[in-house]
Amino acid sequence: TYEVTQSSYTTERFPWPEMRLTDLYLLYAEALNEKDDANNRELAISYLDQIRARAGLKGIKESWDTYSRYPNRYKTQEGLREIIQRERAIELMFEGSRFWDLRRWKTANKVLNEKIHGWNFEGETPAEYYSQRTLYTLKFIAPRDYFWPIHQNDLVVNPKLVQNPGW
């Protein structure tokens, strides 16, 4: 809820856990694929197909066999991993899970260190406006940023604790 005044507003936050069945299906498919067994891969594909069917899309096998440049991608562990990661990025877009997925997959240092490009919105001519420029660069330092620092008080209380790398 919020109240608006002439110069300011106040907000109240109500945190609650939010998880959709789709997220659980995607996590389960990811876990099944990591087991690296043909039967598990088939089961993982069946869960992905349920998600795609809800969205009105064809299943993984039919889609990749028909439309992909790499029709055999879903037949290998690595290929299905890429498919699952892409499905997660699309299905859970703007829900706040991408950063945590990148950390879990250990790809954050690659993806988050890319330059963010955009148009020159201050340009006065079409040529200036549509010219691409770097807006900003993110900085994710591996392995440090995959872990959080252990609070100094905890290190003092328990001298057997060791600070995480980079902190």
Q: What residues fall within each predicted segment?
A:
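Acidic/polar-rich alpha-helix caps and helix-coil junctions
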Residues: 1-167
